[in-house]
């Protein structure tokens, strides 16, 4: 089994979906994971997911497929923040540390593309702290980013954050792939 979460509206997500569907002996399950805005008073407001999926994609409600019980071979997800996003969150059952504990391979692919970043652009490089050093990247077995240049910056950023002795770990798990977009 391969469980894909969130929207497939972006070109690269459709490419990934089709790639997994083309693999022999692979059952692909797509779920739109519930997302919540955090309110100023500390509460949560459910986001009305208006993500449109291509007609050929069947969405399996979270109530109908429980990855905790099914233990899929791979989970592919796009939300790295867990509870570190000040504006929104998902239910903790969908946080990366839980996902990682219930699959053979956890794969993170960013839900966005950035412009290519020059490592000398300190503003852009500093901003990478907001999405690179997040739990989803750390807990994943595999991270697919848009280019070799971005891959090198992820490795550099994570190595700076976690220490020189971790560089080989990041280099082994982060790969550049065609994730589409502009």
What do these predicted regions represent?
Residues 13-177:
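Active-site and donor-binding regions of nucleotide-sugar-utilizing enzymes
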């Amino acid at each position: 089994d391969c469980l894909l979460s969130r929207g497939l509206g972006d070109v690269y997500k459709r490419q990934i979906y089709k790639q997994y569907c083309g693999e022999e002996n692979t059952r692909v399950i797509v779920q739109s994971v519930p997302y919540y805005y955090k309110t100023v008073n500390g509460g949560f407001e459910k986001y009305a997911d208006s993500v449109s999926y291509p007609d050929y994609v069947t969405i399996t409600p979270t109530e109908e497929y429980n990855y905790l019980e099914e233990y899929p071979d791979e989970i592919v997800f796009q939300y790295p923040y867990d509870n570190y996003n000040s504006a929104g969150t998902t239910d903790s059952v969908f946080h990366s540390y839980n996902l990682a504990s219930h699959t053979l391979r956890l794969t993170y692919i960013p839900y966005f593309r950035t412009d290519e970043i020059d490592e000398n652009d300190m503003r852009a490089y500093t901003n990478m702290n907001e999405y690179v050093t997040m739990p989803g990247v750390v807990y994943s077995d595999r991270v697919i980013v848009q280019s070799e240049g971005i891959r090198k910056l992820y490795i550099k950023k994570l190595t700076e954050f976690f220490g020189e002795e971790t560089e080989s770990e990041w280099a082994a798990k982060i790969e550049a792939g065609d994730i589409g977009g502009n």
